[in-house]
């Protein structure tokens, strides 16, 4: 019971440091202290206190490490993993689209090109920088352009959720081992798993991979994790799926009803009848809710789910996210870059990849 209580304490502490939903977290404080690179010596755009404004925010050692990891992995993946994707997620507001679909009402419009371009400017991971020992700063774009075609460029927003679960799972596992556990499996948020040793009967730890085309409890496969040592598993997926089961999206005045035959359940038929589509260069722009942070638009990779086993939960999380956007990413190259940054041996392997159904 002592191990369980200690692990729960780690989860709570990390939540306090990194949750974007807690105003006092270090991530929220960085977001509240977005500093301009323009005149005024980096004065806070959001009116933060003088201990933060213009000088950056001093963070804990763990946050400092996680931020350095985030930037290293953003660079290693060519931006396919991006801890500053928040403005783009807000611009697309897929949660609202999904809510409308579930309610059986017309979907809200997709963002205009100007809105996407403005959000893309605020989503550059280069806006986050380490300006001193454990001191970090988040800046607005420094090109003196405050709007795109009349659309204001939003403030950048950091969110470490893409790798924090993996870090937390590893930390909990390591603590359990340090306290005497001979075998451990830690699962954080259902998508991040860290293991050590074996099960009580000596067999390897196994983890089921959800089937994104099936129901909530459907399993696409089972992964047997390396026995005896430590390993981390991350699964990233399009949990919403193609809205209504078709590759389409509402797009305001440019939209029209989806053409062609309609098949499937009553719910799918109703959704398809209310969906609208936007074309870009002759193709539909919306496959699912996963946004490509490099383009600002939903990814067209044709992948619904990716699972990665790696030597680090942070590495596994970033890779599974990046591969969902671009499955052509050179995994060995990312691993080699990561090993150089951390100074420790690293490994990663894709153990599950589910393609989107065509329909």
Q: Could you say what each language-model-derived stretch is?
A:
Residues 1-359:
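Mature catalytic core of soluble alpha/beta enzymes
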